[in-house]
Amino acid sequence: MPAYRSKTSTAGRNMAGARSLWRATGMKDDDFNKPIIAVVNSFTQFVPGHVHLKDLGQLVAREIEAAGGVAKEFNTIAVDDGIAMGHDGMLYSLPSRDIIADSVEYMVNAHCADAMVCISNCDKITPGMLMAAMRLNIPVIFVSGGPMEAGKTRLANPVTKAVEFKKLDLVDAMVIAADPAYSDADVAEVERSACPTCGSCSGMFTANSMNCLTEALGLSLPGNGTVVATHADREQLFKRAGSRIVELARQYYEQEDARVLPRSVGFKAFENAMTLDIAMGGSTNTILHLLAIAQEAGIDFSMNDIDRLSRVVPQLCKVAPNTNKYHIEDVHRAGGIMAILGELERAGKLHTDVPTVHAPSLGDALNQWDIVRTKDEAVRHFYMAGPAGIPTQVAFSQNTRWPSLDLDRAEGCIRSYEHAFSKEGGLAVLRGNIALDGCVVKTAGVDESILVFEGSAHVTESQDEAVENILNDKVKAGDVVIVRYEGPKGGPGMQEMLYPTSYIKSKGLGKACALLTDGRFSGGTSGLSIGHCSPEAAAGGAIGLVRDGDKIRIDIPNRTIDVLVSDEELARRREEQNAKGWKPAKARPRKVSAALKAYAKLVMSADKGAVRDLSLLDD
């Protein structure tokens, strides 16, 4: 039987000093025979997705202690990608994922915690904590702060002048601000309305995509990805996480049941998570993160697996930014992630024999939580939790219910396989001479008219140069904007390109241009935006050999992307570039700190999840 890890610092005469310090934190004699549960919070006042988490760690802690455990809370850092976007702050976003993973490892191992509850929410926090969970391999439950309510306003159409009701999110504020057809008053109205409450941004952006994927991985409770942050029902997720983690700890340490450990989910759960992501048209960042999490779990899950799944998994859900009709609150009304997983199971696309933290298997969970099949009225009531439309930064502050569930599987937010938005899913891996190790595109956000696209390269050496050229009308219809030396090494930090793609849309070029980068995209990106080009330019990738005017052909149905230049010419250019060194052709006014330089020394390209190259640490 595995010994409680905490006994390392709480048992035996020689640990009297450590016990004395534990007592100084409030522990009593009886507590030394209980599991010590780390409550890993990520509260910060910088991030709307985390601003309401301050007291929620203690909410979980009280439930842990009521269930017979000892709770010890600590915090991680959290970067807001939206606030860091468009300037050098974005260089720190992806590296923060690894800092979060390391900090959780440091705290949990240093203090010998037996299990943990991870309170996450936004872009790099959930994947960072997932990486730590797999690395540590102790019982864990994830509970997120929840999605923001969608913004809502009435705005005059700049063309028809008719006043229209609009559902909004962060991306609308960016696009409208760059569109001269809208007045300053319009921009101010959208700015004030787009992000009305606490929570992670309201579309299927990276944060919500990752929180939804924790349900598919079996590491969170049903509803974790979709109950809005403001709703009282989310409080029950926090309370149940606190009591359930004590049960899981006892199940492992006292009953030797290793099925409760995060690594036990195995390859099948990673396939389920990616299948869900493809079916719901999630953020391309999830590919980066799942690859990294799988490496921490010691699971051989690769771009080849993602490519294979993308060809056979249907798109069953379409949410902002891929449509302005639905946001995460609408996914919840349609039955949430369990409903999408239920449709995937009926389509024969899901492994149901994987464990979860709340049911013996995913199949058992679906029998209770899939609203199409459940007989539990409490489950149906749960999925009627909706937005209140009241601006607030307070969690659990409203109890609004939708008047009905969205059970329309033909034309609703979630579709059945027979009525899928498309028979192929919302994400695709492309390969070709410009991306030998692959690149990714969110096909859910690409108009059908440009699924096959050939255009002329418009080469830029940074995101800043790309933005300047787009705003100054140097980018024309038919261009493929190349943004290079923005990969994990080249940035460093692999910046998100939400501003360039938003400005392309605001210029009316959303269906007339493509953008290719070795950087990445915000989950809020749509259009023909292709990222994670691997190898990246700084690692000698062919994206660094493209020149202005080169023809580039993109063929999403056939999963190819090529620069239409002969192999001989590419070889000649490579010799030239080897002599010059793989660095931007133009100087960039970019301050790269020692911390970022250290990150760049170890990081690998996006096709490996932008994780550290641990071989460089071998003796």
Swiss-Prot record:
Cellular component, GO annotation: cytosol
Pfam families noted in UniProt: ILV_EDD_C (PF24877), ILVD_EDD_N (PF00920)
GO terms for MF: 2 iron, 2 sulfur cluster binding; dihydroxy-acid dehydratase activity; magnesium ion binding
Residues reported in the UniProt entry to bind Mg(2+): D81, D123, K124, E496
Enzyme class: lyase
Keyword Glycosyltransferase: no
E.C. number: 4.2.1.9
Family statement drawn from the similarity comment of this UniProt entry: Belongs to the IlvD/Edd family.
HAMAP family: IlvD
The name this protein goes by in its record: Dihydroxy-acid dehydratase 2
Organism: Cupriavidus pinatubonensis (strain JMP 134 / LMG 1197)
